[in-house]
Regions:
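Terminal targeting signals and extreme-terminal segments of soluble enzymes
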Residues: 1-178
Length: 178
């Protein structure tokens, strides 16, 4: 059985993510994310791929927007759960990032998502709201939720993140000597 050519296509473009990341380490997390949100720095490729937007930023708080689309569907005809996980991971991680000083970064260590309602292209714009629960010297935690335009809760998530610090000057000297 031969398969017909697809009737739908999707293309996207992105900027060099390392150039933006290099600028990010020169400022605190909130200032960096504000430049991304304003368009002064390009968004990361995942945001371009999914069409995610940064709708709100405050210290310890990040809201991302997303328009569910047909190309995001799973085999049963609704938006794939990985899309919800991705936008939750993004808003919760960025909520943590808004609290970090210059040169600090984070990486997700765990992510838990509870799916409470389906998304489709008929859902309309959804927002993922991330809130910091704890930020320490090495670990951070946040929670997030995805709501539709009526405020209906579609998913809830929690995350743990490792906070990374810039290398110490004496550690860099040691690396250069060795």
């Amino acid at each position: 059985m031969s398969r017909a050519e697809p009737a739908r296509t999707r293309t996207f473009s992105w900027d060099d993510p390392l150039a933006s990341a290099a600028k990010g380490v020169t400022m605190d997390g909130l200032d960096y994310l504000r430049l991304v949100a304003s368009g002064e720095l390009p968004p990361p490729p995942i945001a371009s791929l999914l069409g995610m937007t940064i709708d709100e930023l405050e210290h310890g708080h990040a809201v991302f927007g997303l328009e569910p689309a047909e190309w995001m569907y799973n085999p049963i005809g609704s938006v794939h759960g990985g899309i919800a996980a991705t936008i939750l991971d993004s808003c919760m991680g960025c909520a943590i990032h808004t609290t970090l000083p210059q040169g600090h970064a984070f990486t997700t260590t765990d992510l838990q998502v509870r799916y409470l309602g389906a998304m489709s292209h008929d859902t309309g714009k959804v927002q993922a709201i991330g809130e910091v629960v704890h930020v320490g010297g090495r670990v951070a935690a946040a929670e997030g939720r995805i709501v539709d335009g009526d405020g209906t809760l579609l998913a809830h998530g929690t995350t743990g993140c490792l906070v990374t610090r810039p290398p110490r000057a004496d550690a860099q000297r040691h690396r250069q000597v060795v």
